[in-house]
Amino acid sequence: MIANSSHPSMPSSELMASIKQQVQSAIAEDVGSGDLTAQLVPSTQTAKASIIARETAVICGIDWVNACFSEIDPNVKIDWLVEEGAEIKAEQVLCEISGLARSILTAERCALNFLQTLSATATQTRHYVKAIAGTKSQILDTRKTIPNLRWAQKYAVTVGGGGNQRLALYDGVLIKENHIAAAGSIAAILKQALALNSN
């Protein structure tokens, strides 16, 4: 289940589809035709592992981690000890993983990459949200995201307590200096924007 995904511009169905696509792409990039090193481990060898935080953070990306391991091996079991959006401490155990050693070894890097990237975004957002607490200001994101991780990073912003300004070019007008220069003047582009809005 996606936590904190109730923002009206981020339907959970689209986010879930995005997670699947991102995870499949990441695994294809990292694993390719197979994990040569993991194949050195006996195929029936089982293992247990834990993900432990190295520093304080806001946890974000649980669904991506689950999807990474599930994509490699649906039989890998993950028991989470924290919830999405929780503020965790250094050395805190986040989850315990069990299953075939090969599967755990193959999926771990992709899973950790998503967890670290999204938790970093959520953590930094939470820092700024706390800094403006008590004011009328609001922390909003931009489109300056890592390519192919737009939905993921914007989701992480909401987990950190921020808001989504717009998801992409198709769902809102945001006039910048380059648009004004291309249109010829502020008046010209505002006229076009008002005409677009009236339609």
What are these regions (language model features)?
Residues 2-199:
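Acidic/glycine-rich phosphate/pyrophosphate-binding loops and surrounding catalytic core
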